[in-house]
Structure formats: structure tokens, C-alpha cells
A protein has these predicted regions:
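Basic, flexible Lys/Arg- and Gly-enriched helix-loop patches that mediate nucleic-acid binding at interfaces
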Residues: 1-196
Length: 196
């Protein structure tokens, strides 16, 4: 789990700009890690890095219903009517259909937005649809994973076994579904598989 800072690309490599993998030590960069989804360059918050394609696919699939919660500061404050519209699902001006989302108004120009999909600039576009453009955006959680205050921007940590178990449960994966790599380790949690 990485606390992505603003100003860093959610990419594995870029010849001109810093990427999220540049924040990791060299030994971790060699493991074939990729970000699960994307956060815009100016967005910060929880970003999961893994080398397991099946896990990534399930986490990002709207069919898995994995909630992603964002804290946003906006120009102006959305209304309860805006929250009701987002709860029904909306179609943006360009025809992009967005699944129902939960909008909680936390105060003047402050909201929590819960999405179950991750389309291009979706959080920003949905809040702009409400007439309240985003001035700051941070992902707080993804499924059962929560970004704690102990992880500062640019820092990372390995998931605990409990977090791994909850994440697998959330997307319907079990250890038997893990892909084996050359070291006979589960790509999701790097522990030897039972009875290889």
C-alpha cells in the first residue's frame, strides 16, 4: 500500500516524470509491481501495488462492487438533491454512464464520494456535474483497505495478513486462486503456498 503524493504519475515508468514506482526501493521495483487503477497526477491517497493480474482485475471490475472512498474539497458545496442524483447513477454530458455513487456532505465544500468503478477522472467529473469542481482529491480507502494517518505521502507499507485475507474475501479470491511465480509464492501475499 502506497500513500501516493500529488505530483507523481500513477505509472510504472516515464522518461520525464516521477512515477509511483520511483518511490519504492530498487528491490521492490524488480518484482513486477503495477498500480491497481489510477489516481490523477494531482490526486493523492491510497494506491495498491501488486503483481497479481487476477487480483487487479477483480478489484477494478464494477461487478466486484469494491467501494473506493474519496475525500474532496470543492468549490461550493453539493446539495442533497445532487447526492440523490448521484445515488441513482448519472450520464455525463459526453455520454459516459456512471454507476450509482454515494455522496456524503461533510461540511462547507467538503464531501466523501464512494464509487464502485474507476472511469477516467470520474470523481472529479461527477462533482463537476453537481456544479462543484474539485480543488483537492484524496482516496481514503479501497474495499477493506484504509489509508491510515501513520502513512505519510510518499510512504508505503506491506499489507498485514488480516488485510490480505479481507481483500481476497472482498473480491471472492482464496489462496487457491493465487497465481504461482517461479519461487512458488503466491503473488498476492508472498507466502509459500500450502501443498505446492
Amino acid at each position: 500500500m502506497l500513500h501516493k503524493p500529488a505530483g507523481v504519475l500513477t505509472a510504472t515508468e516515464d522518461s520525464r516524470q516521477r512515477t509511483v514506482l520511483d518511490l519504492l526501493p530498487p528491490e521492490l521495483r524488480k518484482r513486477g509491481l503495477s498500480p491497481v487503477g489510477r489516481l490523477d497526477k494531482d490526486t493523492e491517497g491510497l494506491l495498491l501495488l501488486t503483481n497479481d493480474g487476477a487480483l487487479t482485475h477483480r478489484l477494478l471490475s464494477p461487478k466486484s462492487h469494491v467501494d473506493k472512498v474519496y475525500y474532496a474539497r470543492t468549490e461550493g458545496t453539493p446539495t442533497e438533491a445532487d447526492a440523490a442524483r448521484l445515488a441513482q447513477g448519472i450520464t455525463l454530458a459526453d455520454g459516459l454512464r456512471c454507476l450509482p455513487a454515494e455522496l456524503k456532505i461533510c461540511g462547507q465544500g467538503q464531501v466523501l464520494l464512494t464509487l464502485r468503478e474507476g472511469k477516467f477522472h470520474q470523481a472529479k467529473r461527477m462533482l463537476a456535474f453537481c456544479g462543484t469542481p474539485v480543488v483537492y482529491l484524496k482516496r481514503l480507502s479501497m474495499g477493506p483497505l484504509r489509508l491510515g494517518e501513520d502513512l505519510r505521502p510518499g510512504e508505503f507499507r506491506h499489507l498485514t495478513q488480516e488485510e490480505i485475507d479481507k481483500l481476497q474475501q472482498a473480491v471472492g479470491l482464496v489462496a487457491a486462486d493465487c497465481q504461482k511465480n517461479d519461487n512458488n509464492f503466491c503473488k498476492i501475499h508472498k507466502k509459500p503456498l500450502a501443498n505446492p
